[in-house]
């Protein structure tokens, strides 16, 4: 009997459908190589595309399908066409994350191929060997705390940073479980501002310390102030190798800073997870939302030059974390590496290949890898 997985696909806006097409090419080849697996794709609209058709940024039917699926794939959301809407179309993504209860965002920071080291914003001697997994808490903190807008006078406004023990415990367990999936376990560096802040400072540090000591004593835990971490990320990022754990706002900022290291924002995948993988397991079956970290890129959408690697590597993350197909994920990563190493890449990283040519090359590399085995 075949193992069945349902995947909800949101192409999204502008360049989103372009990169999604390449991600699905790769996924189709993975299904071909695994005859005991059946992948059912359900397509829905989100963001501006959903607004144009349905008059809302995401439909109830789409949310229902997503919350019962094995995983969700997303291209990109939003753009200038809908910039003046009273309700931002990007809120569709927020509604999707909330419906899924996606609480932990994962962003790997590394080089998909050795040849990319020369494309980094950092000197090769500084960035070579960077291997970081940023785990960002998504449900609490200043983005969701009570706020007071100014009254039009621009005199005063406020945002309140609120965290609960439960929120911090959950994301700490996620970071610990991901660290334990490697042998030996990865170090965990927790970022905070414990010298001046209460919520994402002293509370954060205290709860993280308790959980790690009680549940993950094998793991080396390091605490670092967020401003110090930002400096280290720019000067010597390998000092942060392992899992970097951060609150919502700090994780938002440090992950964007880190995205400059691999050479192009188009290279980087992400996952937003809804539960915690089993301790010490390299692959799992937990629901997650997978998307490249780049935006909808309206300036280059439709030109056939958008980098699809972030989307393709997001598919690899989905295979590993939601479909329990770790070997397939490893094959995708190897195919991406092989493709980039022979110079087949988009203009953002110095190549001349189109979006579809890169996708086709990754699929061809996947076929070669499969045939070798």
From Swiss-Prot:
Residues annotated to bind substrate: 97, 136
UniProt catalytic activity: (2R,3S)-3-isopropylmalate + NAD(+) = 4-methyl-2-oxopentanoate + CO2 + NADH
Q: Which residues bind NADP(+)?
A: 77-79, 284-289
User: Residue numbers for the site described as Critical for catalysis?
Assistant: 143, 193
**What induces this one?**
Expression is up-regulated more than 10 fold in toxin producing cultures.
Its needed co-factors are:
Mg(2+); Mn(2+)
MF annotations from Gene Ontology = 3-isopropylmalate dehydrogenase activity; magnesium ion binding; NAD binding
The residues that hold Mg(2+) are 227, 252, 256
Q: How is the cofactor bound?
A: Binds 1 Mg(2+) or Mn(2+) ion per subunit.
InterPro entries listed in its UniProt record: IsoCit/isopropylmalate_DH_CS, IsoPropMal-DH-like_dom, Isopropylmalate_DH
Q: Which of the seven top EC classes does this enzyme belong to? A: oxidoreductase
| Other comments on record | Gene clusters encoding host-selective toxins (HSTs) are localized on conditionally dispensable chromosomes (CDCs), also called supernumerary chromosomes, where they are present in multiple copies. The CDCs are not essential for saprophytic growth but controls host-selective pathogenicity.
Subunit organization = Homodimer.
* Role according to the record: 3-isopropylmalate dehydrogenase; part of the gene clusters that mediate the biosynthesis of AM-toxins, host-selective toxins (HSTs) causing Alternaria blotch on apple, a worldwide distributed disease. AM-toxins are cyclic depsipeptides containing the 3 residues 2-hydroxy-isovaleric acid (2-HIV), dehydroalanine, L-alanine which are common for all 3 AM-toxins I to III. The fourth precursor is L-alpha-amino-methoxyphenyl-valeric acid (L-Amv) for AM-toxin I, L-alpha-amino-phenyl-valeric acid (L-Apv) for AM-toxin II, and L-alpha-amino-hydroxyphenyl-valeric acid (L-Ahv) for AM-toxin III.
Q: Which family does it belong to?
A: Belongs to the isocitrate and isopropylmalate dehydrogenases family.
Q: What name appears for this protein in its UniProt entry?
A: 3-isopropylmalate dehydrogenase AMT6
């Amino acid at each position: 009997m075949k193992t069945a997985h349902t995947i909800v696909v949101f192409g999204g806006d502008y360049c989103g459908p372009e990169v999604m097409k390449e991600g699905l090419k790769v996924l189709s080849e993975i299904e071909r190589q695994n005859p005991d697996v059946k992948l059912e794709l359900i397509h829905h609209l989100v963001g501006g595309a959903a607004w144009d058709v349905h008059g809302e940024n995401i439909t109830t039917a789409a949310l229902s399908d997503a919350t019962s699926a094995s995983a969700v794939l997303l291209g990109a959301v939003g753009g200038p066409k809908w910039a003046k809407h009273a309700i931002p179309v990007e809120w569709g993504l927020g509604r999707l994350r909330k419906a899924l209860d996606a609480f932990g965002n994962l962003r790997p920071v590394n080089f998909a191929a050795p040849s990319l080291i020369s494309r980094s914003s950092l000197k090769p001697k500084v960035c070579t060997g960077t291997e970081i997994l940023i785990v960002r808490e998504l449900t609490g903190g200043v983005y969701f705390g009570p706020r007071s807008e100014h009254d039009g006078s621009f005199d005063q406004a406020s945002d309140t940073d609120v965290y609960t023990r439960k929120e911090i415990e959950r994301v700490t367990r996620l970071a610990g479980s991901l660290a334990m999936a490697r042998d030996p376990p990865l170090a965990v560096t927790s970022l905070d501002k414990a010298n001046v802040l209460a919520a994402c400072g002293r509370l954060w540090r205290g709860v993280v310390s308790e959980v790690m000591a009680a549940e993950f004593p094998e793991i080396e835990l390091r605490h670092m102030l967020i401003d110090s971490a930002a400096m280290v990320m720019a000067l010597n990022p390998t000092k942060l190798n392992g899992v970097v754990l951060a609150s919502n706002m700090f994780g938002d900022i440090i992950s964007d800073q880190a995205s400059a290291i691999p050479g192009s924002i188009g290279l980087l995948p992400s996952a937003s997870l809804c539960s915690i993988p089993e301790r010490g397991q390299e692959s799992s079956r937990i629901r997650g939302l997978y998307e490249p970290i780049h935006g909808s890129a309206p300036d280059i959408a439709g030109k056939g030059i958008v980098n699809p690697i972030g989307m393709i590597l997001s598919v690899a993350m989905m295979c590993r974390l939601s479909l329990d197909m770790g070997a397939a994920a490893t094959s995708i990563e190897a195919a991406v590496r092989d493709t980039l190493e022979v110079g087949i890449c988009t203009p953002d990283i110095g190549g001349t290949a189109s979006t579809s040519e890169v996708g086709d090359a990754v699929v061809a590399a996947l076929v070669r890898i499969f045939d070798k085995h």
